[in-house]
Amino acid sequence: MTMAGGRKGLVAPQNTFLENIVRRSNDTNFVLGNAQIVDWPIVYSNDGFCKLSGYHRAEVMQKSSTCSFMYGELTDKDTIEKVRQTFENYEMNSFEILMYKKNRTPVWFFVKIAPIRNEQDKVVLFLCTFSDITAFKQPIEDDSCKGWGKFARLTRALTSSRGVLQQLAPSVQKGENVHKHSRLAEVLQLGSDILPQYKQEAPKTPPHIILHYCVFKTTWDWIILILTFYTAILVPYNVSFKTRQNNVAWLVVDSIVDVIFLVDIVLNFHTTFVGPAGEVISDPKLIRMNYLKTWFVIDLLSCLPYDVINAFENVDEVSAFMGDPGKIGFADQIPPPLEGRESQGISSLFSSLKVVRLLRLGRVARKLDHYIEYGAAVLVLLVCVFGLAAHWMACIWYSIGDYEIFDEDTKTIRNNSWLYQLAMDIGTPYQFNGSGSGKWEGGPSKNSVYISSLYFTMTSLTSVGFGNIAPSTDIEKIFAVAIMMIGSLLYATIFGNVTTIFQQMYANTNRYHEMLNSVRDFLKLYQVPKGLSERVMDYIVSTWSMSRGIDTEKVLQICPKDMRADICVHLNRKVFKEHPAFRLASDGCLRALAMEFQTVHCAPGDLIYHAGESVDSLCFVVSGSLEVIQDDEVVAILGKGDVFGDVFWKEATLAQSCANVRALTYCDLHVIKRDALQKVLEFYTAFSHSFSRNLILTYNLRKRIVFRKISDVKREEEERMKRKNEAPLILPPDHPVRRLFQRFRQQKEARLAAERGGRDLDDLDVEKGSVLTEHSHHGLAKASVVTVRESPATPVAFPAAAAPAGLDHARLQAPGAEGLGPKAGGADCAKRKGWARFKDACGQAEDWSKVSKAESMETLPERTKAAGEATLKKTDSCDSGITKSDLRLDNVGEARSPQDRSPILAEVKHSFYPIPEQTLQAAVLEVKHELKEDIKALSTKMTSIEKQLSEILRILTSRRSSQSPQELFEISRPQSPESERDIFGAS
C-alpha cells in the first residue's frame, strides 16, 4: 500500500537541465562550458564527445570550451578567432573547423555554439555540439586516387560514421524504435530561446495534461466513486427485478452517468501517473500507452449505453407482459406467446449486459489507495462493501423466488416458494384473473419484496437468522447455505478483524505517518526555518518512496553472510559494471567491496559536501545529476557514471573539500568510506594496483581550481582606466594633513634650535653654499663672495679698500647676507665642528628664506619655476655644494679665482685663494661620519612617520567620506622649498 508521498510522486523542484539535454541529444556529441569563468572551462562532456575525440571525460574537464587543446598546425587561425569572439559576445553561431583527436588524427567538425541562460536571463553555460563532417570535405592529405577511389573513400567514411553512431546509441528495450533522430540539432537551429534553462523548476506538465494529485482530479475521483456505487446498486436491481426504464427521468439520469464515465475515460488519457521509480510521468504518449494496456477495455465495456438500446425495444409488446407496474413482473403472468417470449429474451439479454457495468468497480480497486488515506473513509468503505454484498445477495434471492414461483408444467403457482409465503403473510395473495387479462395478479409489491430479500440476506450474512423468512425449495436452501458461508467469512473478516487488518495492511503507512508526525513536531519545537523544513519533509517523502518503508539494513541482518554478500553485489551491480576499475576484481574482492558500499538518496538542493569538510568517502553517481560549486561558480556538472571524492590510495592525509557538491535532481549515490576502501585494497594487493591505475575521478575535491571571473577582469580594467583618467590628488592649504606636516616641521625646528645652542657656528656650510677660507700671507687686491644655492645667485664683490685691515678670510655668502654673518656668537661658533656647522648653516638658510616664506601661495609657482631654471641646483645627496659647483679640492691651489670655474657668471671673475689641504680633509671626514649617523636616525624616524601618516589618512578618509574625492585628496604646494626638503628629504 502506497502512502501519500508515493501516490503523489516526486514533485519537488529539480534542475533537469542535464537530463533534458541528454534526452534531446540522442546521438549528438556535446560539451558544456561555464560562461562566467575566464577561458570558459568545460564542466560536462557526454560519452559521444569522449569517443569522438578520444579523450576521457576527466581529461577534458576544466579545459577550454573552445577545445583549443584539439587545435593543430592545420587549424584555421581566422576560424579560431571567430570561435573566441562568439564566446566573448555570448552569441549563437556555427563553424566548420579542422581539429585533432587525441591520437593527433585530423578531423573536420561542424561546431554549433549556443548560450544557456538561467532564471535571471544571465548566460551561465555554453552548449557546444560537434558533428564529424570529414567525409564531406576535401581530403586533408594529398590523395592521388580519383573517380571510384573518391567514391570508395566516401562510402568507407559513411560506413564508419554509422558504426560509431550504432556504438553510441543507448540500449533500447524490445519493441522500441531504435532509429531516433536527434532533436538537439533542431533546437539549436530554431534559436536559443527554446533551449532548456539552467535553473531549479517544478516538474512541468503540458497544458492538456492533468496532474493526478490536483484538487480537480481528486474531487473528480470522489464523484466517480459515488457514481460507481450508484451503478453497483441499480444494475443488479434492474436486472433481477426486470424493470424497464419507462420513466424518462431515470433514463436521463442513467444516460448522464454513462456520459460521465465516458468523460472519465477521456480524462484518463490526459492524467499523469506515478512511475515505478516514484517519478511523475507526464509524457502524453506514455500516458496513453499505459492506459490502453491496463484499464481502457474494462472502462469502455462498462460505459456502453445499454439503457438506450433497451429504449428502442417495442415498449407496447413488453408492456403486455409487465402487467401492473406496481406489482412483480413475471410471477403473476400467463405464459406469453412464442414471439413474445423471443422478444422478451432479446430484451433480457440487453438487460443482462448491464451487469458489465459492474466492471466500474475496477476504478475503485485501482484508486483504493487514494481513499484509504483517511481512517473514516476506510471504515465507510468497509461498511459499504458489506452492504453492497447484502444487496447483491438480495437481488439473487429474489431472482430465485421469481423463477420458482411459476410452474411451467402445470401453469400454476407453487405454494412452497418464499414469495408465496410472503404474499400470504402480508395479506396480498396471488389471484388468477380469468375474465379479464387472463393473468395472475396480486402478490407483494416490488418494494416489499426487495426489503424482505435484503432482510433475509442481512440476517444470513450476520449469522443471526430469525426464521420468519426461510428457504423451502432445494435451490433456495442451497443458496441459503452459500449465503451463510459467505456471510461468516465477511463478518469475520470485516467486523471481527478490523484492527488486525489495519495493523497488517497499513503497518508501513502507520509507521510512515508516525515518522512524519514526529518530524513535524521536531521542526515545530525547534523552530526550524521554513525552507529547511520543506527540504527535510521532501527528503523523507522521496526516501520513503524509493525504499517503500523497508529497512534494508534490517533485512540484510536477517540473511546469512554469504547471502548478504550476494545481495550487496546485486544492489551495487551498476557500479561494478560501468566502471573499468572493477573489471579485474575477483569475486571475493567484489563481495568484500559490496559489503562496504552504502546507497544514499539525495533530494534536489541537498549538499553532499560542504567546502572545508573532510573528504572521507568515494561517491559513484548512479542516477540524477549534481553540480560542483567553487567560489559561487559552477565548475563541474556530474551525471550518471561519474565519480567524485579523493584519491585515498595515493594520499596519506585526509583531504579537505575545496568545493560544494549539491544535488540538482533526485540522486542515487553509492558511497564507500575511506577506511573501508583502504582496508580492502590492503588485503587485495593485486586488485589495488589495477584499481589505482584504472579508476579516474571525474572531479577531485582535494584540488582547488584557480580561475578568474570575467566580471572581475572587466571590473579591474574599468578601475585601472578610471585611475588613469583621474586628476592629480591635491590637498587644500587648510587640510588636516597639511597642518600635520607643518606641525612636524615646527617640532624639527625646535629640536634643531635646542641642539644649536651648544655647538659652534663658524664652520663651513657646504650644503648652503657658504665656504670660509683663510688667506695666505700674500695680500690680494680684493675678495669675492660666490653664492651657491637653488635660487639664482648674484656674485657680490668687495674692493680691498673696503675690507678691514685684518681680514684673513674670503667669505662665500648669499646675496643680502651681509648683515647675517657671525656676530657676537662667533666665539660659540668657533667651538662647533663638522655636521653641527652644517645644521647651523641650515638654520641660517631658514632665516634667509624669510622673504620666500612671507610670500603668498600665488607667487610660489613663479618662484619655484625661477629656481628650477638655475644652472646650479642642490641635489638630494649629502655632498657639499663645492663639488657640485665645480670647485674641486685638488685644484684649490691654482692661481685663478673660482669664478673661472663657476657656472653662475662667467664674465665676472674673482680670485680664489688656496687653503690648507689637511684642514679641508679633516673637516670633510668629520662631516661624512656625522652624516652617516644622522641618516640612520632620519631613516628610523621617517619609517615611523610613514606608518603614522597611513593610519591618519585612513581615519581622515573615513571621517570625510561625504566630501568629494577631489577635495579629500587635493595636495597643495609646500610653503617653501626648505620646508618641503625637511619633510620629504629623507624619503
Swiss-Prot record:
Region (Required for phosphatidylinositol bisphosphate binding): 151-162
Motif (Selectivity filter): 463-468
GO cellular component, one term: early endosome membrane
SMART domains the record matches: cNMP, PAC
UniProt feature, compositional bias: Basic and acidic residues: 978-987
Reported tissue expression: Detected in cerebellum, cortex and retina.
Regulation: Channel activity is inhibited by interaction with Ca(2+)-bound calmodulin. Interaction of a single pore-forming alpha subunit with a calmodulin chain is sufficient to promote channel closure. Extracellular magnesium ion concentrations up to 4 mM modulate channel activity by slowing down current activation in a reversible fashion. Channel activity is not regulated by cyclic nucleotides. Channel activity is inhibited by binding intracellular phosphatidylinositol-3,5-bisphosphate and phosphatidylinositol-4,5-bisphosphate (PIP2), but is not inhibited by phosphatidylinositol 4-phosphate.
Ranges where the record places region CAD (involved in subunit assembly): 922-962
Membrane-topology annotation of the record: Multi-pass membrane protein
Subcellular location: Cell membrane; Nucleus inner membrane; Cell projection, Dendrite; Cell projection, Axon
Keywords: Calmodulin-binding, Cell membrane, Cell projection, Endosome, Glycoprotein, Ion channel, Ion transport, Lipid-binding, Membrane, Nucleus, Phosphoprotein, Postsynaptic cell membrane, Potassium, Potassium channel, Potassium transport, Synapse, Transmembrane, Transmembrane helix, Transport, Voltage-gated channel
Sample GO molecular function, one term: phosphatidylinositol bisphosphate binding
Location of the region described as Interaction with cyclic nucleotide-binding pocket in the Swiss-Prot/TrEMBL record: 699-701
Gene3D superfamilies in UniProt: 1.10.1200.260, 1.10.287.70, Jelly Rolls, PAS domain
InterPro entries: cNMP-bd_dom, cNMP-bd_dom_sf, Ion_trans_dom, K_chnl_volt-dep_EAG, K_chnl_volt-dep_EAG/ELK/ERG, KCNH_animal-type, PAC, PAS
Intramembrane positions: 449-470
Catalytic activity: K(+)(in) = K(+)(out)
Region (Disordered): 960-987
Glycosylation: residue positions: 415, 433
Region (Calmodulin-binding): 673-770
Record remark: domains: The segment S4 is probably the voltage-sensor and is characterized by a series of positively charged amino acids at every third position. Conformational changes of voltage-sensor are driven by an electric field generated by a potassium gradient across the membrane. The C-terminal region interacts with the cyclic nucleotide-binding domain and contributes to regulate channel gating.
Family: Belongs to the potassium channel family. H (Eag) (TC 1.A.1.20) subfamily. Kv10.1/KCNH1 sub-subfamily.
Function: Pore-forming (alpha) subunit of a voltage-gated delayed rectifier potassium channel that mediates outward-rectifying potassium currents which, on depolarization, reaches a steady-state level and do not inactivate. The activation kinetics depend on the prepulse potential and external divalent cation concentration. With negative prepulses, the current activation is delayed and slowed down several fold, whereas more positive prepulses speed up activation. The time course of activation is biphasic with a fast and a slowly activating current component.
Quaternary organization: Homomultimer. The potassium channel is composed of a homo- or heterotetrameric complex of pore-forming alpha subunits that can associate with modulating beta subunits. Heteromultimer with KCNH5/EAG2. Interacts with ALG10B. Interacts with RABEP1. Interacts (via C-terminus) with CTTN. Interacts (via C-terminal cytoplasmic region) with Ca(2+)-bound calmodulin.
Annotated protein name in UniProt: Voltage-gated delayed rectifier potassium channel KCNH1
